[in-house]
């Protein structure tokens, strides 16, 4: 065993220890912990930095030819079902450790400034450290049971972080939605794990892969059962990586603090699903039906995420749907056997998307003092525009991330996405067509986000009353604003916002509250660049966004087959990569189609949203009325599809939420009136029967009590019934009354 492998357990232990210490301090000594909260944040960051330092050393040992390493200890000794706990280190593990720790450290540095005015500052770092520790534990897990446990811990932390501002109803609902949706996937994952154990007799990833290969070779397995277990296992990644149809939680997860959005959507929670598919790729690749299922789910998710992002006005939600689409690309690549391209895109996308989310947080942080602390305002791209002039560093770094997601060389995502597009087209023209069309949509909506946010004129001042007739993009250019209807035609109105003070309204609950600590004085009419601790992570993330993709470029891999990560990332690749025949000319020729598609999407976006756009405000002007009606209907359909989330949330609400409530009410009524009615009826009849048996049991005392009770009751009735005496003739009075 290599000496350094024996210290791998320190990697998840450091952030776990930080979360435990801060949690105990917050619980036992809240006053002192609050006073020393900056020290608490520094401690969390330093401990995670220790993990970040160890991870590259494991990485270097792997690329220098060290074998994979597995250490395990007996957890529950049992002769039939022995359970072990340990860690497994291979190239996939080492590179994921670097990804999680580097992004995690930068998010912590960023959060120190972003969350500085929040009353839950220390609590945030407790959750953040535990979240990172859970993800690191998942990456190092050596068996399926351990993976399942750490996945549940990741889900619990995401519940806490998405609902961090739990006094806001939207945040409380969002964390519940994410938790319940992931429980559906995790239930399928649990069934799949049990089914795989039944087939192979092992939970250890290395052992079950070998046993499954032997069973396949000897025809000792029922393929229907194996595919069923594999699809059930895949339900876990479907939920965690927000794949269709369990993707509905992802945009609502934007209710959490923006640094958490960066961590969830870049390196941790959503990456956990792709990581599990990669870890179990030995198992999946032997089942063509399951691989086809994975590829189609990925393709549908990629296309759906791109279409849902087209008309989003919320900055973070647009990036969330972008994440959903890119994760679909990764699943598509996994399904067609392009394992290397999928993991390559996972890495390049993680750094690019972390940069974009942290950049959006910088924008939101600067917009809040101007438009208010409501997410409907500070995240609304309709109130932004022209921010590059006021926030140049944020604007430039955000542009880097945008160009990377669009697939423009030499940025990171170009290299990985280009490989996925080429492999998908070679595998299936249908899947390839979906992937290429989605690439064009990606370039369009990412350019749209950048242009609406950073280019043009600053629109917030117009929206809060200084200028009420400022032009805004039309609805038919897929811009979402407040709409009214006039004579059957959809027209735009400028949002009527009331200027807010630079403190949050109480109705927004536990939002970052500058009133607890005086914020820096800002010009309330125009935003300013964020401070150093928020800018530093953006600059550092811009470096891998620009250069890390070139590590996987074919022309750079010649002569370095054992020293670059993407050549050894998987020892069992299902396709071979050409290295000798590819040169600059081949690379350019192969990349022309993807660059052309991305450029077309950017060009359309520039035409509609660019600062020099010459199109009329309403695209119907100057167009034939008959053609305009068709075009308007088409654009309205696209707008409604995007704005209403593809109607899937409404469908789920109608079928599952309302359906379950109706079913629950029906069952409650049946239980109350039928089941309880029968039980209560039997009880009442038993009560009266018992009383009757008591007074009819032959006891003299019981007979006397009954006789006296009856006579008294009869006498009372006779006296109260006055008409009885009036109907009796006078001659019979002496029978009733004695007269003197």
UniProtKB/Swiss-Prot annotation:
GO terms for biological process: ATP synthesis coupled electron transport; electron transport coupled proton transport. Its EC number is 7.1.1.-. It catalyses: a plastoquinone + NADH + (n+1) H(+)(in) = a plastoquinol + NAD(+) + n H(+)(out); a plastoquinone + NADPH + (n+1) H(+)(in) = a plastoquinol + NADP(+) + n H(+)(out). Pfam families: Proton_antipo_C, Proton_antipo_M, Proton_antipo_N. It is found in: Plastid, Chloroplast thylakoid membrane. It is a multi-pass membrane protein. It is an enzyme of class 7 (translocase). InterPro entries: NADH_UbQ_OxRdtase_chlpt_su5_C (IPR002128), NADHpl_OxRdtase_5_subgr (IPR018393), ND/Mrp_TM (IPR001750), NU5C-like (IPR003945), Proton_antipo_N (IPR001516). This is NAD(P)H-quinone oxidoreductase subunit 5, chloroplastic. It comes from Psilotum nudum (Whisk fern). The gene is ndhF.
């Amino acid at each position: 065993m290599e000496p350094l492998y024996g210290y791998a357990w320190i990697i998840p232990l450091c952030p776990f220890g930080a979360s435990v210490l801060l949690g105990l301090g917050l619980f036992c000594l809240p006053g002192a912990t609050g006073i020393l909260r900056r020290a608490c944040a520094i401690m969390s960051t330093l401990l995670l930095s220790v993990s970040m330092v160890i991870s590259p050393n494991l990485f270097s040992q792997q690329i220098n030819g060290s074998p994979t390493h597995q250490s395990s200890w007996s957890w529950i000794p049992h002769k039939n079902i022995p359970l072990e706990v340990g860690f497994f280190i291979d190239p996939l593990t080492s590179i994921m450790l670097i990804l999680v720790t580097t992004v995690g450290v930068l998010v912590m540095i960023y959060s120190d400034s972003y969350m500085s005015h929040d009353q839950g500052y220390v609590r945030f770092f407790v959750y953040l450290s535990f979240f990172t520790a859970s993800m690191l534990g998942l990456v190092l897990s050596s068996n399926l049971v351990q993976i399942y446990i750490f996945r549940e811990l990741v889900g619990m932390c995401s519940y806490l972080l998405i609902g961090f501002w739990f006094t806001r109803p939207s945040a409380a609902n969002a964390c519940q939605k994410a938790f319940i949706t992931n429980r559906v996937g995790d239930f399928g994952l649990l069934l799949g794990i049990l089914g795989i154990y039944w087939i192979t007799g092992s939970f250890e990833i290395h052992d079950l892969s070998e046993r499954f290969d032997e069973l396949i070779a000897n025809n000792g397995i029922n393929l229907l059962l194996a595919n069923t277990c594999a699809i059930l296992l895949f339900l876990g990644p479907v939920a965690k990586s927000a794949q269709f149809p369990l993707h509905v939680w992802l945009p609502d997860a934007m209710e959490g603090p923006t640094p958490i959005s960066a961590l969830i959507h870049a390196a941790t929670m959503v990456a956990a699903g792709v990581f599990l598919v990669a870890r179990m790729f030995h198992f999946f690749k032997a089942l063509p039906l399951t691989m086809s299922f994975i590829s189609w789910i990925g393709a549908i998710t990629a296309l759906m995420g791109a279409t849902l992002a087209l008309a989003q006005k919320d900055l973070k939600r647009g990036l969330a749907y972008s994440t959903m689409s890119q994760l679909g690309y990764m699943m598509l690549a996994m399904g067609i056997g392009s394992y290397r391209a999928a993991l390559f895109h996972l890495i390049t996308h993680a750094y690019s998307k972390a940069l974009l989310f942290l950049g959006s947080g910088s924008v939101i942080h600067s917009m809040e003092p101007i438009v208010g602390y409501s997410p409907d305002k500070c995240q609304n791209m309709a109130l932004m525009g022209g921010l590059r002039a006021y926030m140049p560093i944020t604007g430039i770094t955000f542009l880097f991330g945008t160009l990377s997601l669009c697939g423009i060389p030499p940025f990171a995502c170009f290299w990985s996405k280009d490989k996925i597009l080429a492999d998908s087209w070679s595998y299936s023209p249908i899947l390839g067509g979906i992937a290429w069309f989605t690439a064009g949509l990606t370039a369009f909506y990412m350019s749209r986000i950048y242009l609406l946010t950073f280019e043009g004129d600053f629109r917030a001042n117009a929206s809060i009353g200084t200028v009420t007739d400022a032009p805004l993009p039309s609805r038919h250019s897929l811009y979402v604003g407040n709409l009214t209807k006039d004579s059957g035609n959809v027209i735009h109105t400028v949002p009527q916002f009331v200027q807010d003070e630079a403190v949050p309204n109480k109705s927004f609950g536990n939002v970052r509250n500058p009133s607890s600590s005086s914020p820096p004085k800002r010009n309330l009419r125009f935003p300013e660049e964020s401070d150093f601790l928020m800018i530093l992570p953006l600059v550092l993330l811009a470096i891998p966004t620009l250069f890390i993709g070139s590590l996987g470029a074919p022309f750079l891999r010649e002569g370095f087959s054992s020293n670059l990560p993407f050549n050894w990332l998987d020892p069992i690749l299902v396709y071979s990569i050409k290295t000798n025949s590819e040169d600059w000319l081949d690379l350019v020729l192969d990349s022309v189609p993807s660059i052309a598609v991305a450029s077309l999407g950017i060009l359309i976006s520039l035409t509609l949203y660019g600062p020099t756009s010459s199109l009329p405000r309403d695209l119907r002007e100057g167009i034939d009325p008959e053609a305009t009606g068709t075009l308007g209907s088409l654009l309205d359909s696209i707008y409604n599809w995007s704005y209403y989330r593809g109607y899937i949330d409404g469908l789920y609400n109608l079928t599952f939420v309302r359906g379950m409530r109706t079913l629950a009410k029906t069952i409650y009524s049946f239980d109350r009136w039928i089941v309880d009615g029968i039980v209560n009826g039997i009880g009442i009849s038993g009560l009266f029967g018992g009383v009757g048996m008591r007074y009819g049991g032959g006891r003299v005392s019981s007979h006397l009590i009954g006789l006296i009770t009856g006579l008294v009751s009869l006498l009372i009735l006779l006296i109260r019934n006055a008409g009885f005496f009036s109907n009796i003739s006078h001659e019979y009075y002496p029978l009733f009354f004695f007269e003197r």
